[in-house]
From Swiss-Prot:
InterPro entries: Defensin_beta-like
UniProt-recorded name of the protein: Gallinacin-5
Species of the source: Gallus gallus (Chicken)
Chief location of this protein within or outside the cell: secreted
Family: Belongs to the beta-defensin family.
Keyword Signal: yes
Gene this chain is encoded by: GAL5
Signal sequence, renumbered to the chain: 1-19
Cellular localization per UniProt: Secreted; Cytoplasmic granule
Function: Has bactericidal activity.
Record propeptide residues: 20-25
GO biological process assignments: cell chemotaxis; defense response to bacterium
Amino acid sequence: MQILTLLFAVLLLMLRAEPGLSLARGLPQDCERRGGFCSHKSCPPGIGRIGLCSKEDFCCRSRWYS
């Protein structure tokens, strides 16, 4: 039973460290520096979210950006 508790704790630590699970909140200038743009409430179709510009604005960038 202790092994299950340990495995569960390790799993939670791994999920917290996963960079894709949370969006970085920043300034619009940070978004532009990353090659993105701010969009209110959602990103247009075919465009992915890469962060947050503010509470209601997402930082969006083309999936084909290199």
